[in-house]
């Protein structure tokens, strides 16, 4: 692929978090000059989803040699191709980090159906549709028809069949090689010393309602009331105001809350290395990069028995109810030695390779190269 102009057009309307990480991993695997990125900062998601197609239609040069177009589902691909028909000849690949067909809203009337409809149109306009998990793929396809049935008349049929044949699951490539490896014992400390240490809980998610911060706060307050020893870090990105559930948590937990707020990357990694358990309380998760990152740094993952989590973690790491979560954490905090034995068993059996950038990025590049080869033949 040696050409003066790049062959691969990468578009990301929400260039931050896992969206940015994915593109970074792909760029590292591509030859210099093979690709060109067009992006917008990871702010104001709703406006990015509504208007980015028009923005990029004006920005992408018309004098190009693109043969592959790779974009996240935030972009309304059908709109872009309508505005820029010269890009229609590209092999168009849409990547779903999440899907809007099952995005949880507090009230049905709050749902803006246009986002989900744009995703369906993007799939119809695409040549290939990639999902970061089987759960993401299944939940999207299973809800295409129910979503379209919300239209009061002139029901649209047989759309799932058109999309399904384009779909493929390709896990998000986590660049574990950039992470420090946690040592079993800190130098100078014995196993007995570690048993005396209180359990460090970490919640590293976006501060938004779909991550269910209320369940986290309720659980931590119950542990605090039961007078078990623990400490907790609540980090993750906050794009808006602090959730109301977090407003008085510092007063409620006192010194047990050792970190509260977003941490810069270096400090974040250091904190993960001190953690014992990483918790998810999510109502909305299609992969869970933060959970895997924390697990790789030595934190034992505990997650709901739903969404993507049963696809990734063994049943011992999953809980079915809020009471089960509290009970599991209570027992671990009360008996650190029992916990650390179970954590050791988890890491002996868990395979991180199936989620690693080293294993997965070549599969993405094979897709790009195949499409370019098809165009050249």
Curated annotation (Swiss-Prot):
Entry EC number(s): 2.4.1.110
UniProt signal peptide: none
EC top class named in words: transferase
Gene3D superfamilies per the UniProt record, alphabetical: Glycogen Phosphorylase B
GO molecular function: mannosyltransferase activity
Domain of life: Eukaryota
Keyword ATP-binding applies: no
Keyword Amino-acid biosynthesis: no
Alphabetically ordered keywords of this record: Glycosyltransferase, Transferase
InterPro entries cross-referenced by the UniProt entry: Glyco_trans_1 (IPR001296), GT-like_domain_containing_1 (IPR051862), QTMAN_N (IPR022701)
Reaction catalysed by this enzyme: queuosine(34) in tRNA(Asp) + GDP-alpha-D-mannose = O-4''-alpha-D-mannosylqueuosine(34) in tRNA(Asp) + GDP + H(+)
Family: Belongs to the glycosyltransferase group 1 family. Glycosyltransferase 4 subfamily.
Its job: Glycosyltransferase that specifically catalyzes mannosylation of cytoplasmic tRNA(Asp) modified with queuosine at position 34 (queuosine(34)). Mannosylates the cyclopentene moiety of queuosine(34) in tRNA(Asp) to form mannosyl-queuosine(34).
Protein name listed in UniProt: tRNA-queuosine alpha-mannosyltransferase
Originating species: Drosophila melanogaster (Fruit fly)
Source lineage: Eukaryota, Metazoa, Ecdysozoa, Arthropoda, Hexapoda
